[in-house]
């Protein structure tokens, strides 16, 4: 039982460590001439959805649409 608890805590620790630096290193959408649109709405012309690459400062229910240069 103790071993299982140790393994679970270790796994949670590893997942936490992996998730923190990734979030910190992502630039905000605005710094890439991006704009936020509500999830489910298409991105405007000349933009592409980039929710997997950029953090959207507007909140968790939104995604980024970044301009194509």
UniProtKB/Swiss-Prot annotation:
Intrachain disulfide bonds: none
Keywords: Disulfide bond, Nematocyst, Neurotoxin, Secreted, Signal, Toxin
Function as written in the Swiss-Prot or TrEMBL entry: Induces neurotoxic symptoms on zebrafish. Has also been claimed to be implied in calcification, but this function seems improbable.
GO MF assignments: toxin activity
Top-level taxon in the UniProt lineage: Eukaryota
Listed GO CC annotations: extracellular region; nematocyst
PTM text: Contains 4 disulfide bonds.
Further facts: This protein indicates that the SCRiP family is also present in Actiniaria (sea anemones) and not only in Scleractinia (stony corals). This family has firstly been claimed to be implied in calcification, however, as this family is also present in sea anemones and that they are not calcified, this function seems improbable.
High-level lineage: Eukaryota, Metazoa, Cnidaria, Anthozoa, Hexacorallia
Signal peptide (UniProt feature, chain positions): 1-19
Entry's transmembrane regions: none
Organism for this UniProt entry: Metridium senile
Localization per record: Secreted; Nematocyst
Pro-piece positions: 20-22
Protein name: Small cysteine-rich protein
Family indicated by similarity: Belongs to the Cnidaria small cysteine-rich protein (SCRiP) family. delta subfamily.
